[in-house]
């Protein structure tokens, strides 16, 4: 065979591989509002940067007539490319080939790119669109899942892992995304669950739709499994690119620093009036975040889940930073089980990848009641406490208003190796709020006062006394628990100056096999 013929054969095979399961199935994919695996990769990566690997791999199964159904690539497109010039590894399941069902060889392809990503220290992005295990392969398919899971575990905290759910993801397949750092789901065509609606109906008699069982809305608002819910695939792929811009390539590097055109010493006079005079009146801490970060650019994580706490990425002076903030606009910013888990997971991610943490505190306490106690608020609150105490990255905390009792301790307090703790003049750092403290300290005397007016006057007097003595930032500052009380409009400048000072921080935890975080 002449070389020209061999080259022609190569080109024909490449074209065959790019068609996946064939044009008819590609058309069906498009009719559902979904892109093909290669179309997704083309949008995700820098133009012309994709280097595909294992394009000619096929499955090895002969049972059930599969020996007569061979497709080049075997249902997953794998390789590497760049995003903003930085190397990433990617795999995208191809629903046009056996519904994207996982085979032994398919898992080998995925494991191969994950292994390579670990060798070079680059992020892995998985695009999931699969009907589950390839039943015809039996235990080999299950073993393939386990091989992938082990690599997810090994890569955790070493390289960033992002999962995009752009179709079905059911049964054992859900565990790979669950082991990654971030999950993105499309609102229209994606779902995740361990057991589908039919099994649910058979086993427990419950009627539930696919969307209500495991759609993007459920997982981004109720379960917290998904960190993002996007309208369509294009938005999701763009989001991955933006997310990676805040994150380092691996745990041995720092996040990319960008040129900052936002003045470091910019003053925000509106911050001097943003805290209401009434301590029980809400405000949205999101307004404070956008006022102090570079150019108001903030990428919120878990936006629609546990809204009483906000987490996400921003920049100060071009430096990537993780922000954790109580939000009084929702449930008064109180900490509950979901908010505690949300905050703890984000803090641990930032610590794993050398991203400094800025905490904005306005928290009245933990949510009381049997519902929270039965749900394990003690353990969930301990997760947030543990995450802050374990972290060794630069940590700057600004107390905006309330910081009471146990919730004060779990939100980046000085004793948990926090580096810099600022407070606004409006800060109230105490065991509890003034009204509650007066009820405890003077409850007996209050009960003895029969005249309502005299009682109210006595309570008001005691509340004022307690506030002046304890519910302020100066009592904590007197003991060195607060490094400085700052004018709100200076917050951006003071945070940046603190972060600059901490760039060379070195701190290590005691040597151990691993920690035993309260799960």
Each language-model region and where it sits:
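Ligand-binding clefts of soluble mixed alpha/beta catalytic domains
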Residues: 1-519
